[in-house]
From Swiss-Prot:
Residues 1-20 are annotated as: Disordered. InterPro entries: YaaA (IPR005583). This is UPF0246 protein CE1889. Signal peptide: none annotated. Belongs to the UPF0246 family.
Amino acid sequence: MLILLPPSETKTPGGAGAPLDLPSLSFPELTDVRESIITDLGALSPDDALPVLGISEKLRPEAVANTVLRSAPTMPAVLRYSGVLYDALAADTLTPAALNRLAIGSALFGVVRAGDHIPHYRLSGGTKLPGAQGTTPTMKARWGTTITDALAGVDELIIDLRSGTYQQLGKVPGAVTVRVESVLGDGTRKVVSHFNKHYKGELARVLATSPREATTAGEVADIARGAGMTVEINEGRKETLTLVV
């Protein structure tokens, strides 16, 4: 199984890896789009990049980082991203076999494997990045069907834990998706928003470290239940699971 995670706006700076080597990244069919985005992103001066990226002057170093993407040090993608989901995942304690089950969606790289080395950058899935001839295409338009096509070549079950914005960059027909809901005092359900990433990080860790290999949504649910989680299979949408917290 391949567990597809969302990226994080917060990232670990620095790195000890060699500069970005696009041809070495997983899913090489995404290289051309990656190349064009890196070129357009690097062409923006920090002053111009701030409003495009939707960040304040306080985050100017993020915009500066985008100008040195080809020469900056790198680190494994799963360690580059930080924040709530990645804290719960605790990737630095995972075995190579567990890490091999993880991939990460992003606006800059489309999809990478956990061990792919990437630099520090700033770019979200909702950004409209100026391109050639004065156009400002959305990230969805830039990626088109390339992410979907690349993931169609994966011959194992995909568990898509990306947020809606990143799912829109490349939908995966047949993938297992997960909703996180909490039970209120009166017994009704509420979709979890604030801690959604935390619980998905916990689920990703459970799945990545499982000795079992899931091939169906039901088997994903069984693995999670075996770890003490409450998971339901939605009637009528067998690929959609609900994690109840």
